[in-house]
Amino acid sequence: MITGEPVMVMHGGPGAGSHSSATRFFDLQRYRVILFDQRGCGKSSPSASEDDATAALTDNTTRHLIDDVSALRHELNIDGKMHVFGGSWGSTLALAYAIAHPATVQTLILRGVFLCRRADVDYFFQGNAAEFAPDPLAMPVPGTYLDFPTAWRHFVDAIPPKDRGDIVKGLAKIFAVPPRTEAERARLVKAASACVAWEGSASRLNHDENSHGQPNGKYALTVARIMVYYMINGGFLDAKSEASRDNNYILDNVARLSGCACWATDIIPIEPHDCSPV
């Protein structure tokens, strides 16, 4: 029988899949670290990397993922409270799970907290895309692009100019149609790779702006499709109402977490991570 304090790891993306590197944050002699691939990605099937991703995106919402975590608890005989760990989208899912099932959460350990509000998504994806200027500093619109201008140009160049008024909607339009020819598939992979490369660039403090290596096509399709599908639906955070990009679900329900200890990790120059209670 496997013992140790259970830690449920929520991976990012959404769509990035789990990775064993997440275990390095824990003493495996003390903690039982649980990794799982969310619907449509990693080792889960069907995969969003297929030409037609309809099956992978059907019954794939935050509510379904929360139910999957509950099913895992049952399957792994976790009867008491557990630690819940996640970064970026993983922090979103961790918070949504804790709001739904606060009695099962001992601690929340979060990094790169993402609340999945329209303002958060627009800050990351939109920037000056509507009136794309080669010199991002010529545009006063705030956004992540100001910190990564070269990577931003590579990203926006993959989006048709007519669809840059709403980048997320434009990407959703591209990913909605299964490719019928190799040329169409190449365009699809190009857009997906640009999307994932941008996300990777803007998620790292030490990213080399002059490096524009593209992620694996299958991986890029998986992450980009699932990520855009969730972002355009506000992360499917409120199961009681229609999916919407205009919500503040987590902060509106944060009082439900009053019984959970919550730690947020801050990236600082000297050390990789520093934990402080919030």
Task: Tell me the role of every PLM-derived stretch.
Residues 63-82:
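Conserved acidic catalytic loop of the alpha/beta-hydrolase fold
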Residues 91-102, 108:
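Short glycine-enriched nucleophile-adjacent loop
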Residues 257-259, 264-266:
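Short beta-strand/loop motif that positions the catalytic acidic residue
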Residues 1-50:
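Conserved HGGG/HGGXW glycine-rich cap/lid loop of the alpha/beta-hydrolase fold
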Residues 163-242:
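Alpha/beta-hydrolase fold active-site neighborhood
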Residues 238, 266-276:
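Conserved alpha/beta-hydrolase "acid-adjacent" motif
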Residues 103-173:
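A catalytic-pocket lid/entrance helix-loop region that shapes and gates access to the active site
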Residues 84-85, 264:
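Conserved alpha/beta-hydrolase fold motif
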